[in-house]
Amino acid sequence: MAMNGRARKEAIQATARELLKFVNRSPSPFHVVAECRSRLLQAGFRELKETEGWDIVPENKYFLTRNSSSIIAFAVGGQYVPGNGFSLIGAHTDSPCLRVKRKSRRSQVGYHQVGVETYGGGIWSTWFDRDLTLAGRVIIKCPTSGRLEQRLVHIERPILRIPHLAIHLQRNINENFGPNTEIHLVPILATAVQEELEKGTPEPGPLGATDERHHSVLMSLLCTHLGLSPDSIMEMELCLADTQPAVLGGAYEEFIFAPRLDNLHSCFCALQALIDSCASPASLARDPHVRMVTLYDNEEVGSESAQGAQSLLTELILRRISASPQRLTAFEEAIPKSFMISADMAHAVHPNYSDKHEENHRPLFHKGPVIKVNSKQRYASNAVSESMIREVAGQVGVPLQDLMVRNDSPCGTTIGPILASRLGLRVLDLGSPQLAMHSIRETACTTGVLQTLTLFKGFFELFPSVSRNLLVD
């Protein structure tokens, strides 16, 4: 039964608010995976370890992590046998950000600063004058066992700032502002004057190992937050993050104003669709495929890592699930029967820069997820994969849009072409429309969350039947 206008808006906003929770709990890729892990465990998925043997059973649900920054979750259909296909949705856990250098201790004209490195292709000017903090992981040595352990850290208050230079000292700042990423993107942590007032005159003598690399006040903040002593911290991987939470906005609360929508929007929709598709035991019981979500780290820097889409991770997992002594070519048989949605955000047409889009391909808010096509294979979509997803979308009532870039414009890429070429897998590139991609604060629409989630859930439930009607190799 169709929902009335009010009920539909309530459903749209409820789903969008769940995305807000997901984003606010995920200030780094490590936190993304921790949040996904928590949701999967709550939904009855069982954790696997790559280093152990697996006993994969139909109608059961599993997940594994690598580097604590990539996660793969899958549910095995009740009718699955080795050689059957995989229904996959892939996305990425990382977003452009600034990351703390291994030796971050910097001081200039009385300010204590933190040296940072750019990660990905961020719009770095948007990081100025923001209330920034730190999130990520530290590796500690347990004083009792001597083991190396990981701890997640997220200091939930502003501790860092990158101030703009006053316009009086740079009159052309509104015409030409391009910060030098090595010199101008160094956040302020504290002043030396205040540190002396807080601590008193420091004792002369050699600095400790961590104090040589990082300011003592930074280490003190981290240790206080984690309840650790400074000498227990071996290494750190820390991202800078905005402390302003993700929110709904606009006169009708139809917009999502948030950090890291590229690509936490897709991560959330993919993961929740997998969980929701398994909520009915009957749905999974009659599925001949394996439903799978693959969320990779390091997409924003090329995916060439042990936990990235360029690695052997996906192939190894698919091979382990397919393995059968009675059917030695099960993996090779499964790949042509499989399909992946490469889920990554799409550029909505901008009201102030509409000429940047090709005139017949201008995605709008509220009009559905966007199929992304590029003849130069920057996206992996083709006529076959597009037709199959259109069939699914039609059955679940989700509208679709199209995006092709102008001939005189560069085109980004995704994990789609990587996995299509690496596995020989049929792939479609698709994403929800957004504005301000790679800004510290991005913009999407509330409708896009429910539309994308509905499409993804429909894909998991319907793809096996849709694929049986495909007469193309």
UniProtKB/Swiss-Prot annotation:
* Intrachain disulfide bonds: none
Phosphoprotein: present as a keyword of the record? yes
Q: What class of enzyme is it?
A: hydrolase
Where on this chain does Zn(2+) 1 bind?
H92, D262, D344
Residues annotated as binding substrate: H168, E299, D344, H347, K372, Y379
Subunit (UniProt) = Tetrahedron-shaped homododecamer built from six homodimers.
The UniProt entry's sequence similarity note says:
Belongs to the peptidase M18 family.
Q: What is this protein called?
A: Aspartyl aminopeptidase
Which species does this protein come from? Mus musculus (Mouse)
